Every structure is written in C-alpha cells, then in structure tokens.
UniProtKB/Swiss-Prot annotation:
The lineage of its organism: Bacteria, Bacillati, Bacillota, Bacilli, Lactobacillales. PROSITE patterns: RIBOSOMAL_L1. Belongs to the universal ribosomal protein uL1 family. The keyword Protein biosynthesis does not apply. This is Large ribosomal subunit protein uL1. Part of the 50S ribosomal subunit. Binds directly to 23S rRNA. The L1 stalk is quite mobile in the ribosome, and is involved in E site tRNA release. The keyword Nucleotidyltransferase does not apply.
Length: 229
C-alpha cells in the first residue's frame, strides 16, 4: 500500500486540481500519471445539471465508440429458434432461454452484456433483482431488446457502450485503455461528448455540464474543459 501511495502522490503532483485541461492535455496526463501494472481502463465522468426525477430529464442510451473500448465483452442472448442461431453466428458467447435464467438465479454472472428478443422479456423479467442493480437488464433504449440480435451482438463486441445518469446526474463511461494511442482516446472522448451534448433535455436549467473529468483505473481524476471537446 505504501508504494501505491507514493505513486499516487507523484501522480497528483503532476495535475493541477484547479485547472480544467483541454481534452488533448487531459488524455496525455492520464497516460503519463497511470501507475497501474496492467492495461488500465480509461473512463470519463460527467456531472450534469439535470433533475432525473423528471421523466424528460432522464438520460440513458448506448453508442458505438469509433475506436472500440479495448475490452472483450462476454455477450449473453436470450432467444429461441432462428434468432438463437443468428446470435450464435454473430459471435454471442451464451445463448439460451429458461436454462440461462436458472443458471443466473443460481449465482452465475460471467457475462458483461445481456441481449433479448422482445418475446423473451417475459422470462428475462424474472431476473430483474439480479440484472437490474448491475445495469444488465435488457432495455429498448440501449438497443438490447431487439429482433436484430446479430447487429446487437456485433455492436456489443465492437465497442458499444451504454450510459445512464444516476440520481445525482452523474454519467460515467468507458472510452478505452491506457495503451490506446492518445488520438484514439481523444476521438472516443469527443464522440461520447457529442452524444452527451445532444442528450441535453430542453427543460434543463443553468449550466448543463457542471463538471467533466477523465481518469484511469486507480488513477488521478483530471478536470476537462468541455469547450475543448
């Protein structure tokens, strides 16, 4: 722990906590201050001035990053018949029906994304208490309840991310790995920022983006100037 503390202190010394950096500067600092002994994930965080208690100010959705996430997603699909075969052909890791429901209820959670055809939601609904808190429940808004299971699987494997504002208006998203070239991280960041900007509710008041930051796993949080995006 002592060694990590020294590394964190050294990283903190390189970052001015009172400054909002340009996206290029921030990405460079994330790479420079990373001290994890593995290929750390890079995440961005937005604090939005919204009231999620209002239906028209709830922000949730999905997008495909231009350069992917660098993470291998394990995709589970609830489908039957021809749709199950389409999911398998597209590269789904697990495909099934009631058998998967029983397995998940038994404690198995070795997957990252859950997709379902609309007709399967009746049985998937039984898993609400398990999948809901983990943000794994299929939802039409994120494209995970669909008849086009092949496309959904391919997107999930190819860099699709989901996002959702919490009760305090915070949104977090994975945009890549520290090993990514800086320009690819910048491009992913800008693509996600565009989505956040377009998601601004018409009824939102005041400064929409109260704070934007970027960090790596175990790394330092770095403020970003939204105008640089």
């Amino acid at each position: 722990m002592a060694k990590k503390s020294k590394q964190m202190l050294a990283a903190l010394e390189k970052v001015d906590s009172t400054k909002a950096y340009s996206v290029e500067e921030a990405v460079a600092l994330v790479k420079e201050t990373n001290f994890a002994k593995f290929d750390a994930s890079v995440e961005v965080a937005y604090n939005l001035n919204i009231d999620v208690r209002k239906a028209d100010q709830q922000i949730r959705g999905a997008m495909v990053l231009p350069n992917g996430t660098g993470k291998t997603q394990r995709v589970l699909v609830f489908a039957r018949g021809a749709k199950a075969e389409e999911a398998k052909a597209a590269g789904a890791d697990f495909v099934g029906e009631d058998d998967l429901v029983a397995k998940i209820n038994g404690g198995w959670l070795d997957f990252d994304v859950v997709i379902a055809t609309p007709d399967m939601m009746a049985i998937v609904g039984r898993l609400g208490r398990v999948l809901g808190p983990r943000n794994l429940m299929p939802n039409p808004k994120t494209g995970t309840v669909t008849m086009d299971v092949a496309k959904a699987v391919e997107e999930s494997k190819g860099g699709k991310i989901t996002y959702r504002a919490d009760k305090a208006g915070n949104v977090q998203a994975l945009i890549g790995k520290v090993s990514f070239d800086a320009d690819k991280l910048v491009e992913n960041f800008k693509a996600f920022h565009d989505v956040m900007a377009k998601a601004k509710p018409a009824t939102a008041k005041g400064t929409y983006m109260a704070n934007v930051s970027i960090t790596s796993t175990q790394g330092v949080g770095i403020k970003v100037d939204p105008n640089s995006l």
